[in-house]
Amino acid sequence: MSEDRPTLLVGLGNPGQKYAETRHNIGFMLIDRLAQDWGVKLSEDRKFQGEYGETAVPGLGKIRLLKPTTFMNQSGRSLRAVLDWYKLTPQQILVIYDDMDLPLGRLRLRQSGSAGTHNGMKSIISHLSSKDFPRLRLGISLPRSQSNDRHDATVSHVLGKFAVSEQSLLKQVLDLAQEATETALRSGVETAMNRYNARSLEAPAPVA
């Protein structure tokens, strides 16, 4: 088992039914899927300001799952609390979040990097005082709207739900993201990067 493998998976999103299944919550979606598959019960933990659970996964060892419930812009507070409590290093985490600059059907693993325009990542980098931690970006595509107000178009896009026509591809993306995550946990982030960063999924062609 690789020495650089993550042990804490952090999915970013906004809490509450209002934001469930929105593009901005694709990180939450993957954590929920992993929790279900691994039999992990996620419970609200006040000291962590998030939904938290842990388990021993066969072949992967002890894994912790976290969904910050601070709202996206304060995600770093929740993650910092977990790192301090368990004395984990930034290199032991994998942050999973949405990325508009990648099309739906692409994912990108990196060992470090900037936050770009993602406010959840800005909060995490600020609270960790470091950009050196693994992350998994899941593409949600750019807004299709040609609105003159780019900010409004962006907000509407990330807080909007995936279209019916995107649901099949979304499921494939989550399948692939789960594979990539489990590879990172088992063999290290670099191995997962080499195996999955070049993969590209496309929506199935409509039946004639």
From Swiss-Prot:
Binding site for tRNA: 19, 71, 73, 119
GO MF annotation list: peptidyl-tRNA hydrolase activity; tRNA binding
Class in the EC hierarchy, top level: hydrolase
An annotated GO cellular component: cytoplasm
One GO-annotated biological process of the protein: protein quality control for misfolded or incompletely synthesized proteins
RNA-binding in keyword set: yes
Keywords attached to this entry: Cytoplasm, Hydrolase, RNA-binding, tRNA-binding
EC number from the UniProt entry: 3.1.1.29
Localization: Cytoplasm
Highest taxon of source: Bacteria
Main localization, broad class: cytoplasm
Transmembrane segments: none
Enzymatic reactions: an N-acyl-L-alpha-aminoacyl-tRNA + H2O = an N-acyl-L-amino acid + a tRNA + H(+)
Site (Discriminates between blocked and unblocked aminoacyl-tRNA) residue list: 14
Site (Stabilizes the basic form of H active site to accept a proton): 98
This protein's record includes keyword tRNA-binding: yes
Any Pfam family hit: Pept_tRNA_hydro
Subunit structure: Monomer.
Stated family: Belongs to the PTH family.
Described purpose of this protein according to its UniProt entry: Hydrolyzes ribosome-free peptidyl-tRNAs (with 1 or more amino acids incorporated), which drop off the ribosome during protein synthesis, or as a result of ribosome stalling. Catalyzes the release of premature peptidyl moieties from peptidyl-tRNA molecules trapped in stalled 50S ribosomal subunits, and thus maintains levels of free tRNAs and 50S ribosomes.
Stored PANTHER family: PEPTIDYL-TRNA HYDROLASE
Designated name of the protein: Peptidyl-tRNA hydrolase
Organism: Synechococcus elongatus (strain ATCC 33912 / PCC 7942 / FACHB-805) (Anacystis nidulans R2)
Phylogenetic classification of the source organism: Bacteria, Bacillati, Cyanobacteriota, Cyanophyceae, Synechococcales
Gene: pth
